[in-house]
Amino acid sequence: MQVLHVCSEMFPLLKTGGLADVIGALPAAQIADGVDVRVLLPGFPDIRRGIPDAHVVSRRDTFAGKISLLFGHYNGVGIYLIDAPHLYERPGSPYHDTNLYAYTDNVLRFALLGWVGCEMACGLDPFWRPDVVHAHDWHAGLAPAYLAARGRPAKSVFTVHNLAYQGMFYAKHMDDIELPWSFFNMHGLEFNGQLSFLKAGLYYADHITAVSPTYAREITEPQFAYGMEGLLRQRHLEGRLSGILNGVDEKIWNPESDLLLASRYKRDTLEEKAENKRQLQIAMGLKVNDKVPLFAVVSRLTNQKGLDLVLEALPGLLEQGGQLALLGAGDPVLQEGFLAAAAEHPGQVGVQIGYHEAFSHRIMGGADVILVPSRFEPCGLTQLYGLKYGTLPLVRRTGGLADTVSDSSLENLADGIASGFVFEDSNAWSLLRAIRRAFVLWSRPSLWRFVQRQAMAMDFSWQVAAKSYRELYYRLK
């Protein structure tokens, strides 16, 4: 079984979000599981630099100009790169310029990604041809459409990491991307009069996966589907929509071997975690005190992530004696709010605006509770890292958060399945009640330790996801 992942980023070469973490870990787990997996990426400068051994496999004239297909390896995974400097070699992010304006030729830049994904199934590399083309998010959404236009030379899977990003472009661009105009209708890639790369992936793929079972159910409902609920409900009824939970890359996220921690620890040596807390309190300007619970946030500061709720609930958290350490950036209003709280409560609130991968490890190792109060969360990796590090996740019951964290209710404690704190409603009152439950459990140290050990024993390795994907691929054959 030969599988080609088609996507726009891969950790650690290039990362703007959780998609990169998935592509950085899943292919290696699949190779270990016996699947012949390779990855296709645009030749962005950071990616090119990370694969210096890449050599030319093929050259083509395309609708987007002359390109070369390169092949190299990264950490044992075969990587194809689309070498098209006129499209990909630019400053700024992969998607927008330094002024945060989307590149005007994004329609060509990412149509080309899907086109090359399809051409791989038609023999673009004469020595390797995929049985399954596995496309990720809107950037790769046209791959299943091109495969459909070419008579489906390979099966296709389309994974939705976040349905909110839809890859919308003017209809006139159908003339530029070498897809038949017959595809531009409601039973195709048309959406609200425009061309949607996301809908192309959803409509033409042989199977759709979401990154958690709960998110797969949620996206059939209007409040989560952004207008795609009719199509997704139909795919669900056809048995062509499922949820496969993301995993944790244990080579990177493991408190037993994490060199970024002041003190490494495991389930049986949880007392070693205390030094990480002390160091984190010092680093964030918090009062050094192991008797109070330290709550943490590592997140983009947006309303989708529920960070406005944290700001609203913060006085209640502080009144009960808790501390807050926050690492993140985003909405200027939220940034100002948290910075003001840090100024008003020195020693109790520490804020660092920005994102630093290394510091996020130190927070995960040092905090007692990690807050993930998202309004929607397709999978979420932060809560999985929290579970792995014995930093109990406090989450809202949505998407992957609902699938991975069990509330420390009396019943769950009795059954030995409690692993964190879960609240239902998207409001500060509901969040505060969960925070209150965290304080109650904190006051019972032996129970807290019991829940930590339970959380750390859970298996969210990529091997589990790799097995589920393998079973899906074989069902499609």
Curated annotation (Swiss-Prot):
GO terms for molecular function: alpha-1,4-glucan glucosyltransferase (ADP-glucose donor) activity; alpha-1,4-glucan glucosyltransferase (UDP-glucose donor) activity. It holds the Pfam family Glyco_transf_5. The keyword Transferase applies. ADP-alpha-D-glucose binds at residue 15. Its EC number is 2.4.1.21. GO terms for biological process: glycogen biosynthetic process. Gene3D superfamilies: Glycogen Phosphorylase B (3.40.50.2000). Pathway: Glycan biosynthesis; glycogen biosynthesis. GO terms for cellular component: cytosol. It catalyses: [(1->4)-alpha-D-glucosyl](n) + ADP-alpha-D-glucose = [(1->4)-alpha-D-glucosyl](n+1) + ADP + H(+). Keywords: Glycogen biosynthesis, Glycosyltransferase, Transferase. NCBIfam families: glgA, PRK00654.1-2. Belongs to the glycosyltransferase 1 family. Bacterial/plant glycogen synthase subfamily. Synthesizes alpha-1,4-glucan chains using ADP-glucose. PANTHER family: ALPHA AMYLASE DOMAIN-CONTAINING PROTEIN, GRANULE-BOUND STARCH SYNTHASE 1, CHLOROPLASTIC/AMYLOPLASTIC. This is Glycogen synthase. It comes from Salmonella paratyphi C (strain RKS4594). The lineage of its organism: Bacteria, Pseudomonadati, Pseudomonadota, Gammaproteobacteria, Enterobacterales.
